[in-house]
Amino acid sequence: MEKRTSYCGELNEAHIGQSVVLHGWVQKRRDLGGLIFIDLRDREGIVQVVFNPEFSKEALEIADSVRNEFVVTIKGTVHARGEKAINEKLATGKVEVLAEEITILNTSKTPPFYIEDGVNVSDELRLKYRYLDLRRPEMNNIFKMRHTVTRTFRNKLDALGFFDIETPYLTKSTPEGARDYLVPSRVYPGNFYALPQSPQILKQLLMTAGFDKYYQIVRCFRDEDLRGDRQPEFTQIDLETSFLTKEEIQAITEDMLVDVVKEAKNITIEKPFPRMTYKEAMDRFGSDKPDIRFGLELQNVSDVVKDVDFKVFQSAIENGGEVKAINAKAAAANFSRKDLDALGVFVANYGAKGLAWLKVEAGELKGPIAKFFPEDKAAELKVALQAEDGDLLLFAADKADIVAASLGALRNKLGKDLNLINEEELAFLWVTDWPLFEYDEEAERYVSAHHPFTLPKEEDIPLLETDSSKVMAEAYDIVLNGYEIGGGSLRIYKKEVQESMFRALGFTDESAKEQFGFLMDALEYGTPPHGGIALGLDRIVMILAGRNNLRDTIAFPKTGSAVDPLTNAPGEVSEAQLAELKLETVKKETN
């Protein structure tokens, strides 16, 4: 096999007259009046190859037998295309290769779908034949971008003096967060390793060890219900530092992300990124990861409507809730009564009992609840919401968390439906000043908002075991276009504070020691102040590549039900394997 001289997609007018050797796949073959044209594809693109009997009759005869997706080697000379034959859609469209020789390296069955961009095929089939799906240029380009992003992160962290240190994949199962994937031990029957949800504790121990600056591009595993931007295994850019403030960690993160966007998209992002407290994000956007590319902010109108004779509003306020509204500017004409009823059904998915609405027409409020607003209250509401003719006013009344969840989701939906989002914009945002705990309604207790190793704000440490709801965290999330792409914090580095944290979470001293004794021991040996952040590589690439599903950025992903159609994982194992592990499966009873 002759050595390749060029990739197909690299050929241009500078190569005219040169002899080249190309390897690739047959994208398309056309027989036109004694000439055969083959579009040859490799990872860099497509080039047209011409087989002319006057130039090589033998090559033409072989080319006549090839079919789509055959793997071939072609030797020939680069020529300029005629002016009428130029293909502006191809990067190589001004040249073609006149073939002298062709060698068929391997044949191909007819693929189950065309290997081209924009092909209409189910996700299930794409994943079953993922090796074919990945041949498509748009998929190839995503993984080129992923490589660029990963390389840029590595180069930046290396330049900043970070050490790339691996941590184990077989670790100890610990509570909090998502369910663990468990791995049975053959040597110790009845005992299990866990695949890490993150290297959190181990990277903290590396700070105790004195490494000062650590990073790792690491696989993480979480057995949780899936959605479009989640996978059971994913990759994060994980870093930890000692002796730095959270502002310094944020600055490092911004430097990395600015470099990544420049390398991957050739877009310059301004620093520093905007900052917003958790409370402000929830108040204004109804989300702890707000998309700030568009408006439609939530506005609290409780004071305006508290005296309005509308029982839904009155009841919510009397029960400690609130009334908030979104003013969809100039959108009234876009929504019929049926459309507005559908929005009511939509917000019900987020706990709302309904969606009240008003339209502004000829200076007056119109709609089912307009009758509850006397002239003075109508005027006050219009001022509060800066409402004008043509505006659509949407209201939710309930407990604060339900109002935030329902209107926050509605805001995102309206942003898309009304085409308010500039899809080319990249809007980074820091969300800071998080509560240390959040209340779990099902468990009827407070749980960690991030993880149990997050440092409380110093002034709140005395409240850990007495008034958990008021404790704030030294935590910070980084958001991009409405997606959380990273979370970080300063960490607890003193044993007594960590013990207090565990007690606040409901651990007994005995259970804390059983689960985290090794960490508690380490905190007694001069652990320095430290903190870090973990960035979701898959999600960052997804956003930069303009995709809406993580599956497109992972070479061999799972479906929404955590199944791999390519390998049929997960699958059953043999009785012999189970016996070796001292395991038995529980058979489901069938009626």
From Swiss-Prot:
Q: Which residues bind ATP?
A: R222, D223, E224, Q231, E484, G536, L537, D538, R539
- Enzyme Commission number(s): 6.1.1.12
Q: Which cysteines are joined by disulfide bonds?
A: none
Entry keyword Protein biosynthesis: yes
Q: Which GO terms describe its biological process?
A: aspartyl-tRNA aminoacylation
Region annotation Aspartate: where it falls in the sequence: 200-203
Quaternary structure annotation from Swiss-Prot or TrEMBL = Homodimer.
| Role description | Catalyzes the attachment of L-aspartate to tRNA(Asp) in a two-step reaction: L-aspartate is first activated by ATP to form Asp-AMP and then transferred to the acceptor end of tRNA(Asp).
Which NCBIfam families does this UniProt record tie to the protein? aspS_bact (TIGR00459), PRK00476.1 (NF001750)
Q: What is this protein called?
A: Aspartate--tRNA ligase
| Record lineage | Bacteria, Bacillati, Bacillota, Bacilli, Bacillales
